[in-house]
């Protein structure tokens, strides 16, 4: 096993490494979005190298990271991360709305995303939602809930990853298929206090839990079945 404790550079972001490896052969270490969030893992490259990744805590691999380079053979071990696509919802339009409309829309959007068990991160007046179903279904949910006035589009996860902190990347890509959702929808005013609206864990599906000093039941449908659960 070859132990990897440091990242040498990034062939996509670092012009020095891009130039250095322009004629090199890439031996890819292909990771899915779950594996990419781990600072320690063991996996073989496409050419069969047994690699043990042991990075510092909170250091995660990025697409294009160079893990090893043999100058004699001109072969570089480079990370390739396969991330799922992301729905990007633009909240900028809400800045022109009244405070009441802004709060109402943010709350309803948070509820709609949470009700679908979709994880989300908000940043730079946008909401990022990793795809867990077909784009046609996500498009339908947005329109069914009356969010046609909010522009949204679908982009590659690799385009969003550089905009995120490590913790945000873990939330968005580290197991987006999980059903225990933590939704975070904020006011597009980008104010840390006061008028900033933050909604966490809009819809969680554990066992019964309480809100304040009361409990209540509700039910909803998933596909071809219904179920009740407590809040």
Swiss-Prot record:
Location in the cell: Cytoplasm
Region named Disordered: 185-231
Signal peptide: none
Molecular-function GO terms, alphabetical: nickel cation binding; unfolded protein binding
Bias type Basic and acidic residues, positions: 204-231
Chief location: cytoplasm
InterPro entries xrefs: UreE, UreE_N, UreE_N_sf
Function: Involved in urease metallocenter assembly. Binds nickel. Probably functions as a nickel donor during metallocenter assembly.
UniProt family annotation: Belongs to the UreE family.
NCBIfam families: PRK13262.1
Protein name: Urease accessory protein UreE
Organism listed in the record: Yersinia pseudotuberculosis serotype O:1b (strain IP 31758)
Lineage of origin: Bacteria, Pseudomonadati, Pseudomonadota, Gammaproteobacteria, Enterobacterales
The encoding gene: ureE
């Amino acid at each position: 096993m070859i132990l990897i404790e440091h990242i040498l550079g990034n062939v996509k972001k670092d012009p020095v490494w891009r130039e250095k490896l322009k004629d090199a052969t890439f031996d890819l270490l292909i990771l899915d979005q779950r594996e990419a969030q781990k600072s320690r893992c063991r996996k073989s490259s496409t050419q069969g190298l047994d690699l043990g990744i042991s990075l510092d805590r909170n250091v995660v691999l990025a697409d294009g990271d160079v893990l090893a380079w043999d100058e004699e053979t001109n072969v570089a071990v480079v990370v390739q991360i396969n991330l799922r696509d992301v729905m990007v919802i633009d909240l900028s339009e809400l800045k022109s709305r009244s405070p009441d409309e802004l709060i109402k829309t943010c709350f309803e959007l948070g509820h709609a995303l949470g009700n679908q068990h979709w994880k989300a991160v908000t940043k730079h007046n946008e909401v990022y939602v990793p795809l867990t179903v077909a784009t046609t279904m996500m498009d339908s949910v947005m329109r069914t809930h009356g969010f046609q006035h909010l522009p949204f589009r679908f982009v590659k996860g690799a385009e969003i990853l550089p905009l995120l902190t490590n913790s945000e990347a873990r939330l968005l890509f580290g197991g987006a298929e999980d059903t225990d959702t933590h939704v975070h929808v904020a006011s597009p005013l980008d104010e840390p206090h006061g008028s900033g609206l933050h909604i966490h864990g809009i819809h969680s599906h554990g066992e019964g839990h309480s809100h304040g000093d009361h409990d209540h039941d509700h039910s909803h449908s998933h596909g071809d079945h219904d179920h009740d659960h407590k809040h």
